[in-house]
Amino acid sequence: MKRALILFAALAIPTAAAGHHGWSSYDTEQVLRLDARFTSVSWSNPHGHATMTYRGKQWHVVLAPVARMEARGLTPAMIAPGKRVQLVGYPRKDGTTEMRIERLTAEGKTVELR
């Protein structure tokens, strides 16, 4: 039983880590610069998330870890749903309506998220 558990952990942990840090799935050649309003925000780890409407579709937005956003002066109130934000980021290569944000400006403050 102990061997099975060790084998499971050895196989599962790298898979989870690779999925979590799959930044190569974003198209860094296609930079999106958007003026938007989030429709929802999740201030949580391992990364904050938000949703917004862009080109008539609902997009999932991947932010930075909460500790990094807070250390750089970003607060949940600054990006609350309905508030205007400017985003610079990359869309997914597979066409999924999701983008990874590199830079966010809210209430006149620009924050580098990566």
What feature does the model see in each segment?
Residues 92-114:
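OB-fold/S1-family single-stranded nucleic acid-binding modules
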Residues 36-38:
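Conserved hydrophobic positions within beta-strands
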Residues 57-66:
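A short macromolecule-binding patch
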Residues 70-87:
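Short nucleic-acid-contacting surface segments enriched for D/E, G, S/T with interspersed K/R
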Residues 17-32:
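Short boundary/loop segments of OB/S1/cold-shock single-stranded nucleic-acid-binding domains
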Residues 44-53:
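Short aromatic-glycine-enriched beta-strand elements
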Residues 1-4:
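Positively charged n-region of N-terminal signal peptides that target proteins for export
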